From Swiss-Prot:
<dbReference type="Pfam" id="PF04551">
    <property type="entry name" value="GcpE"/>
</dbReference>
<dbReference type="GO" id="GO:0005506">
    <property type="term" value="F:iron ion binding"/>
</dbReference>
<feature type="binding site">
    <location>
        <position position="263"/>
    </location>
    <ligand>
        <name>[4Fe-4S] cluster</name>
    </ligand>
</feature>
<keyword id="KW-0408">Iron</keyword>
<feature type="binding site">
    <location>
        <position position="305"/>
    </location>
    <ligand>
        <name>[4Fe-4S] cluster</name>
    </ligand>
</feature>
<comment type="function">
    <text>Converts 2C-methyl-D-erythritol 2,4-cyclodiphosphate (ME-2,4cPP) into 1-hydroxy-2-methyl-2-(E)-butenyl 4-diphosphate.</text>
</comment>
<dbReference type="InterPro" id="IPR011060">
    <property type="entry name" value="RibuloseP-bd_barrel"/>
</dbReference>
<comment type="pathway">
    <text>Isoprenoid biosynthesis; isopentenyl diphosphate biosynthesis via DXP pathway; isopentenyl diphosphate from 1-deoxy-D-xylulose 5-phosphate: step 5/6.</text>
</comment>
<keyword id="KW-0560">Oxidoreductase</keyword>
<dbReference type="InterPro" id="IPR011005">
    <property type="entry name" value="Dihydropteroate_synth-like_sf"/>
</dbReference>
<dbReference type="GO" id="GO:0019288">
    <property type="term" value="P:isopentenyl diphosphate biosynthetic process, methylerythritol 4-phosphate pathway"/>
</dbReference>
<keyword id="KW-0414">Isoprene biosynthesis</keyword>
<dbReference type="GO" id="GO:0051539">
    <property type="term" value="F:4 iron, 4 sulfur cluster binding"/>
</dbReference>
<keyword id="KW-0411">Iron-sulfur</keyword>
<comment type="similarity">
    <text>Belongs to the IspG family.</text>
</comment>
<feature type="binding site">
    <location>
        <position position="298"/>
    </location>
    <ligand>
        <name>[4Fe-4S] cluster</name>
    </ligand>
</feature>
<dbReference type="GO" id="GO:0141197">
    <property type="term" value="F:4-hydroxy-3-methylbut-2-enyl-diphosphate synthase activity (flavodoxin)"/>
</dbReference>
Length: 348
C-alpha cells in the first residue's frame, strides 16, 4: 500500500490540494487564451473528461483581460501561467483566477513581487513555483547536478515568498529526463511541507510521451510524492487527462471509469481481438462506472485468466463467452459479443 507524503493543505477554488485530499488531475489549454469562445469550449470538454484544474498561458494583457469572461463560464479552478511581467499576475488576480504559476525570482524588482504577493494574500490565492530544467538561473553553482540546481532554484523562490509571510505555496520541478525529475522531487520532498505538482515536461507525442510520463509520474506517486499531476503531451488536452487517470488507477490511487483488461493475443487467437478491444475501449470512454472489463482472445483460458474482471468476453471463431468474475454467463455469436458485453455493463 502506498503511503503518501504528508503535505500542507491549500485551497484552489473549490478544490483542496495536499494533506489527505485525493491527488488532482490537471491539464493546460492548447487554445489561444485571447480566443474566449474556443478556450471556454475546451475547458468545458476537459471538465467532462474529469479534469480538475486547468492552467492557461497569459502572454499579454489581452489574455489577462479574457480571463474576466472565461472565469464565470467554467467550473474548475483556473491557474494563470505568468512569466516575468508582474502586471499580468495582478491583472489575472483581478480577473478572478484561482491560482498563479510564477517564479517570484523572475519578476525582478522586490516591490513588484510584494505587490503580487499582497494581492494574492488578500484573495487567498495560492502560487505555484514551477521550476523547469530547461530554464534554470545562470548563476547556480556549476558543480551541482541538474536536479540539485532545480532544487536550489526552487528553494530560492520559496524563500522569497516565505520572507513575505506567504504560505499558500505549491511547487513543481520538471525535466524531460525522468531520473533527473525523480531525483529533484525526492530531494525537495524532504525539505519543504508544501504540496507538490508532479509531471515530466516536453515528453512529446503520445507514442513516447505516455511511456515517459507513466514511468516518471508513476515512480514518484509510488513513493508517495505528488498532490497534483499533469501528463504533458503534444496532443489534445483530453488525452492528457485520460492518461493521468490511467496512471492513478494503475496504482489504486484514484478510480474513475472502467479499466479495460485485454490479452496481447497469440496463435490461439482466431478473431480480430485488436479491433474488438479498441471498439470496447471507445465505448468504455463514455462510461463512468469504476468497473474492470476484460476482452480476451481465447475462449479456453480467457475467463480464468481474467477472473478479476467484473465482466468480460472471451472471443472464439464464430462465437465467444460472456462471463462475470470468471464464471460463464452465456455463449454469444461472434458478431454480437461487443453489444452483449455493453448491455451487461449497462445493467450493472
Amino acid at each position: 500500500m502506498i503511503t503518501r507524503r504528508q503535505s500542507t493543505e491549500i485551497r484552489l477554488g473549490n478544490l483542496t490540494i495536499g494533506g489527505s485530499a485525493p491527488i488532482s488531475v490537471q491539464s493546460m489549454t492548447k487554445t489561444d487564451t485571447r480566443n474566449i469562445p474556443a478556450t471556454i469550449a475546451q475547458i468545458k470538454e476537459l471538465e467532462e473528461c474529469g479534469c480538475e484544474i486547468i492552467r492557461l498561458a497569459i502572454p499579454d494583457m489581452e489574455a489577462a483581460s479574457a480571463l474576466k469572461s472565461i472565469r464565470p463560464k467554467v467550473k474548475i479552478p483556473i491557474v494563470a501561467d505568468i512569466h516575468f511581467d508582474y502586471r499580468l499576475a495582478l491583472a489575472s488576480l483581478s480577473a478572478g483566477v484561482d491560482g498563479l504559476r510564477l517564479n517570484p525570482g523572475n519578476i525582478g524588482d522586490p516591490e513588484r513581487v510584494k505587490a503580487v504577493v499582497k494581492s494574492a494574500k488578500e484573495r487567498e490565492i495560492p502560487i505555484r513555483i514551477g521550476v523547469n530544467a530547461g530554464s534554470l538561473p545562470k548563476d547556480l553553482p556549476p558543480e551541482l547536478t541538474i536536479a540539485q540546481k532545480m532544487v536550489k532554484a526552487a528553494m530560492g523562490h520559496i524563500k522569497i515568498l516565505e520572507g513575505l509571510d506567504f504560505g499558500l505555496i505549491k511547487v513543481s520541478l520538471k525535466a524531460f529526463d525522468v531520473p533527473t525529475t525523480i531525483e529533484a522531487y525526492t530531494q525537495i520532498a524532504s525539505l519543504i511541507p508544501y504540496p507538490l505538482h508532479v509531471g515530466i515536461t516536453e515528453t512529446g507525442t503520445p507514442k513516447t510521451g505516455l511511456v515517459r510520463s507513466a514511468v516518471g509520474i508513476g515512480n514518484l506517486l509510488y513513493m508517495g510524492i505528488g498532490d497534483t499531476i499533469r501528463v504533458s503531451l503534444t496532443a489534445p488536452p483530453h488525452e492528457e487527462v485520460f492518461a493521468a487517470y490511467e496512471i492513478l488507477k494503475s496504482l489504486n490511487l484514484r478510480q474513475r471509469g472502467p479499466i479495460l483488461v485485454s490479452c496481447p493475443t497469440c496463435s490461439r487467437t482466431e478473431v480480430d481481438i485488436v479491433g474488438i478491444a479498441s471498439q470496447v475501449q471507445e465505448a468504455l470512454n463514455k462510461i463512468d462506472k469504476p468497473i474492470r472489463v476484460a476482452v480476451m482472445g481465447c475462449a479456453v483460458n480467457g475467463p480464468g485468466e481474467a477472473k478479476e474482471a467484473d465482466l468480460g468476453i472471451a472471443c472464439g471463431k464464430g462465437q465467444g463467452l460472456l462471463f462475470r468474475k470468471g464464471e460463464k454467463i452465456a455463449v454469444v455469436p461472434e458478431d454480437e459479443l461487443v453489444d452483449a458485453l455493453l448491455r451487461e455493463i449497462a445493467s450493472l
